Amino acid sequence: MFLLYEYDIFWAFLIISSVIPILAFRISGLLAPTSKGPEKLSSYESGIEPMGDAWLQFRIRYYMFALVFVVFDVETIFLYPWALSFDILGVSVFIEALIFVLILVLGLVYAWRKGALEWS
C-alpha cells in the first residue's frame, strides 16, 4: 500500500527550500535603491580606477585545454566507481565501459586533428 504521509518531510523540505530563496530575492528587490549613480555605472577593476579602455578584448588560448581536461575529468568520475565494482558487475558492463572509453578517445582524436591541443 502506498502511503502519502511518508513523503511529508520531503514535501515540506522542498517547499521551504523553494520559498526561502524567492523571499530573499523579493525582499532585496524591495529594499534595494533604484537609482543608479555614476559609481554604479563605472567599470571596476580590483578596487582602482581602470587605466585606459576598460573594455579591452583579449584571447584566451588555453580554453580548449580546459575543455578537454573537463571531458576527461568527467570520464574519471564515471569510471572510478566502475573500476571499484568491476568484479561484481560482469562482462556486459565491461563492454559498456569500453564503448564509453572508445567514444572519448574518438573525441580526443577529433580535438587533436582540429588543433585544439596546439598552443599557437
Swiss-Prot record:
Subcellular localization, as worded in the UniProt entry: Plastid, Chloroplast thylakoid membrane
This protein's UniProt keywords: Chloroplast, Membrane, NAD, NADP, Plastid, Plastoquinone, Quinone, Thylakoid, Translocase, Transmembrane, Transmembrane helix, Transport
Catalytic activity from the UniProt record: a plastoquinone + NADH + (n+1) H(+)(in) = a plastoquinol + NAD(+) + n H(+)(out); a plastoquinone + NADPH + (n+1) H(+)(in) = a plastoquinol + NADP(+) + n H(+)(out)
Bilayer topology annotation: Multi-pass membrane protein
GO terms classed as biological process: photosynthesis, light reaction
GO molecular function terms attached to this record: NADH dehydrogenase (ubiquinone) activity; quinone binding
Domain of life: Eukaryota
One GO location term (cellular component): NADH dehydrogenase complex
Enzyme class (EC, first level): translocase
Record keyword Membrane present: yes
Coiled-coil parts of chain: none
Chief location bin: plastid
EC number(s) stated in the UniProt entry for this protein: 7.1.1.-
TM regions (residue ranges): 2-22, 64-84, 88-108
HAMAP family: NDH1_NuoA
Physiological role: NDH shuttles electrons from NAD(P)H:plastoquinone, via FMN and iron-sulfur (Fe-S) centers, to quinones in the photosynthetic chain and possibly in a chloroplast respiratory chain. The immediate electron acceptor for the enzyme in this species is believed to be plastoquinone. Couples the redox reaction to proton translocation, and thus conserves the redox energy in a proton gradient.
Family: Belongs to the complex I subunit 3 family.
Assembly and interaction partners: NDH is composed of at least 16 different subunits, 5 of which are encoded in the nucleus.
Protein name: NAD(P)H-quinone oxidoreductase subunit 3, chloroplastic
Species whose genome carries this gene: Oenothera argillicola
Lineage: Eukaryota, Viridiplantae, Streptophyta, Embryophyta, Tracheophyta
Recorded name of the encoding gene: ndhC
